[in-house]
Amino acid sequence: GSDEQKDKWLPQLAKGKKVGCFGLTESHGGSDPTNMKTHAKKDGDDWILNGSKMWITNGSIADVCVVWAMTDEGVKGFLVEKEMPGFNAQEIHNKFSLRASVTAALFFDNVRIPSSNVLPGIVGMKGPLSCLSQARYGISWGVIGAAQACLEEALNYSNERVLFNKPVS
């Protein structure tokens, strides 16, 4: 972000006084962000944002969202503030996993974004993808940890279980 964007958001985010989220995934695209449908069109000094994002961690409690959208120039990042007219975040309930994580769908209906809320110097997929490798490591480590715990529980159970007066394992 610009120095002004960093000054406005980073201190409050670091103190936990504000919450942010990262909006890249779309319901039809999943892990293929190059198939992005969310788009922004220049309108004077502002941008008009339309589309939606899905499975966004902290989306319904975020004060600011980094949202990636297709423009005539390519993909750009926009800072969408929760009180902007036309922005709506809906929490997703009854998930199969990650139930302790607040997850939401984000909707943009002619959201007017000032040029001061556009991430500078980033056009194309390099911006959003530069963040994803580290995030994906975190997800994979969690899955590996859960799988390891399941294996250990199964082994412990099979070592303790007795059927027909004989140990199962």
Model segments located where?
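N-terminal glycine-rich flavin-associated loop
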Residues: 1-4, 30-33
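Residue-level signal for inorganic ion chemistry
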Residues: 2, 51, 78, 108, ...
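A short, Trp-centered hydrophobic/proline-enriched beta-strand micro-motif
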Residues: 16-24
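Short Gly/Pro-enriched turn/cap motifs at secondary-structure boundaries
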Residues: 28-31, 55-58, 70, 95-102
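Short glycine/proline-enriched turns and hinge-like loops at secondary-structure junctions
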Residues: 32-34, 45, 58-62, 99-101, ...
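A structural signal for short hydrophobic beta-strand segments in well-ordered beta-sheet cores
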Residues: 38-41
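A short core secondary-structure module
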Residues: 50-90
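Glycine-rich beta->alpha junctions and the first turn(s) of the following alpha-helix
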Residues: 88-169
